[in-house]
Design a protein with these regions (language model features):
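ATP-binding Walker
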Residues: 14
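ATP-dependent small-molecule kinase phosphotransfer cores
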Residues: 36-95, 101-102
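NTP-dependent small-molecule kinase module
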Residues: 133, 139-141, 155-192
Length: 192
């Protein structure tokens, strides 16, 4: 049976990365190794931490339509190969991807039949007062960074209606319980 590709989006501070990492740690999902053009950091291994590519190889793969999603961040390119995701899905593995709203829209538009059949997405929404408290509680960002993140969150929240599911965040444990319930439910789809 085909696994589920669950795209998880939400503003900074929503807990989306924590949910994805915990599901992987608990063996509920498989890890997809991303590609990057940046240089390996000490201890990183090609094919384990990332697929380290030259900018030329990366650009050729973009031109060939081999990436499910890709972006350039701080001068380096990052992306997820369609073939890697399809291989995991066809092996019956669930894959979760922590992706911003623009990346989610790109994946949603993918025309690959396997990706389309396995696809689901969820938006993690945090009420604005709670989100501000979380961002301030981190005690890692300057005031202007917090304000920027809150403005970005409002813009991202405006796109919540593009998603199949919404998880209104409460606390880590109840969020994780509902997140895993969604993964379980998606695994019962008969359309796969």
């Amino acid at each position: 049976m085909l696994g589920t590709l669950l795209i998880v989006s939400g503003p900074s501070g929503s807990g989306k990365t924590t949910l994805c990492r915990r599901a992987e740690k608990d063996g509920l999902t498989a890890y997809s190794i991303s590609c990057t053009t940046r240089q390996p950091r000490p201890g990183e291994q090609d094919g384990v931490d990332y697929h380290f590519l030259t900018p030329e190889v990366f650009a050729a793969q973009v031109a060939a339509g081999e990436f499910l999603e890709h972006a350039t961040v701080h001068g380096n390119s990052y992306g997820t190969l369609k073939s890697d995701i399809i291989q995991l899905l066809e092996a019956g593995k669930n894959v979760v991807m922590d992706i911003d709203v623009q990346g989610a829209a790109s994946i949603r538009a993918c025309d690959d039949a396997t990706i389309r059949r396995a696809y689901a997405d969820v938006y993690i929404h945090v009420p604005s007062a709670e989100l501000e408290a979380r961002l301030r509680g981190r005690q890692t960002d300057a005031e202007e960074v917090i304000q920027l993140r809150l403005r970005n969150a409002a813009a991202e929240d405006a796109r919540m209606g593009e998603y199949q599911f919404a998880l209104v965040s409460a606390d880590r444990e109840s969020d994780y319980s509902r997140f895993t319930a969604l993964l379980t439910t998606l695994g019962m789809r008969t359309t796969l």
